């Protein structure tokens, strides 16, 4: 891909080392890649990982039980994910997530995803145009 998961890991690590309480909900074991309870990647010292559970259910579980400042997950797309993000952001926690789409205009064409945009303060579009992880745009208004 364009480096979305790698960027997520780096953001998690940076936030954790700045003493934010970070919870990663890793439905498909791609962000943390746990092995015997340890991440294959450096995700920082104050990061909790919930792996192998439904994304929406997992986000709400960590919200209730871990009191995170930030919840991180990948590949948002189902209505239940969007509903969970709404509950999380209404509770005061932040969400950092990835979504597949060429650009913001493509995302805005889907009514369910368009509704989700109001829960985010920043949207970054990545590509591989100048190598994996190329930041094409960083938007604070859409």
Where are these regions (language model features)?
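Conserved P-loop NTPase
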Residues: 118, 122-142
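Structural recognition of the conserved hydrophobic beta-strand(s) that form the central parallel beta-sheet
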Residues: 24-25, 70-74, 94-100, 125
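Glycine-rich phosphate-binding P-loop
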Residues: 1-15
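Proline-aspartate-enriched helix->loop->beta-strand connector
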Residues: 62-72, 76
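A short acidic, amphipathic alpha-helical/loop segment
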Residues: 83-87
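Loop/turn-to-beta-strand initiation segments
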Residues: 20-21, 44-47, 67-70, 91-97
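Glycine-rich, charge-decorated loop segments at or immediately adjacent to ligand/cofactor-binding or catalytic sites
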Residues: 34, 104-116
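P-loop NTPase switch/communication element
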Residues: 16-62
């Amino acid at each position: 891909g364009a480096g979305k998961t790698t960027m997520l890991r780096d953001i998690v690590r940076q936030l954790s080392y700045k003493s934010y309480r970070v919870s990663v909900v890793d439905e498909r074991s791609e962000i943390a890649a746990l092995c015997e309870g340890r991440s294959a990647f450096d995700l920082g010292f104050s990061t909790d990982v919930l792996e192998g559970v439904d994304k929406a259910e997992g986000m709400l579980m960590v919200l209730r039980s871990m009191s995170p400042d930030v919840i991180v997950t990948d590949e948002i797309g189902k209505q239940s994910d969007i509903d969970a993000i709404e509950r999380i952001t209404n509770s005061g926690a932040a969400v950092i997530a990835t979504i597949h789409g060429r650009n913001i205009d493509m995302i805005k064409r889907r009514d369910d995803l368009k509704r989700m945009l109001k829960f985010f303060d920043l949207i970054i579009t990545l590509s591989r145009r100048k190598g994996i992880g190329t930041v094409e745009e960083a938007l604070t208004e859409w």
